[in-house]
Design a protein with these regions (language model features):
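Bacterial lipoprotein signal-peptidase II cleavage site
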Residues: 17-25
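Active-site loop-to-helix "anion-binding N-cap" substructures in soluble metabolic enzymes
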Residues: 53-57, 71-74
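Post-signal peptide N-terminal segment of mature Sec-exported envelope proteins
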Residues: 25-45
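Short, surface-exposed beta-strand/strand-loop-strand elements in extracellular ectodomains
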Residues: 91-101, 143-145
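Sec-dependent signal peptide recognition
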Residues: 2-9
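C-terminal motif of bacterial Sec signal peptides marking the signal peptidase cleavage site
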Residues: 13-15
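Beta-strand cores of secreted/periplasmic/IMS beta-sandwich domains, seen most often
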Residues: 70-93, 118-125, 129
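Extracellular/periplasmic metallocenter environments
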Residues: 19, 38-54, 65-67, 110-147
Length: 147
């Protein structure tokens, strides 16, 4: 219990600290947005297939709840993102282009091409990326990474 209290106090101190030059609310500008998960260290998205036409995602991203066929998702640079894939016959890739095959992969992504496992990624630069089935051209969605 003592270790838990110490950890809780440390988390409060770290969470309340701020970088120099900010607005007094930490490095994340205060916006009173209930979906702002700036203190969350990771995002988990469940990925299944809907036939050969769509990936079905559910979970949360920076904008809140995510659910449906091939939804667009948004993250910030440095977020820890885990796609929990259960999609037999549909190899799951994170790419720089919405392309078939195994080319155009984002570097630094673990477990690319899985049909049953976790694909993890910590985006290092802002931009537009894609989650893609390497076999079916209709199975893809847009990933937006912001600073």
């Amino acid at each position: 219990m003592k270790k838990f209290k110490t950890l809780l106090i440390m988390l409060l101190i770290v969470g309340c600290s701020s970088d120099s030059g900010d607005d007094g609310y930490g490095s994340n500008n205060y916006n009173n947005n209930d979906n702002d998960q700036s203190s969350v260290t990771g995002y988990n998205l469940s990925v299944t297939s809907n036939g050969m036409s769509d990936y079905k995602l559910s979970g949360k991203d920076r904008n809140g709840n995510v659910s449906g066929n091939d939804p667009s998702v948004t993250f910030k640079v440095g977020d820890q993102v885990t796609f929990m894939v259960t999609a037999s016959g549909h190899p799951f890739y994170l790419k720089t282009k919405a392309s078939l095959g195994t080319g155009d992969q984002i570097s630094g992504v673990s477990n690319q091409g899985t049909v049953n496992g976790n694909v993890t990624w910590k985006p290092s630069s802002a931009g537009t990326y894609y989650y893609v089935c390497s076999k079916h051209s209709n199975m893809f969605g847009v990933i937006t990474v912001v600073n």
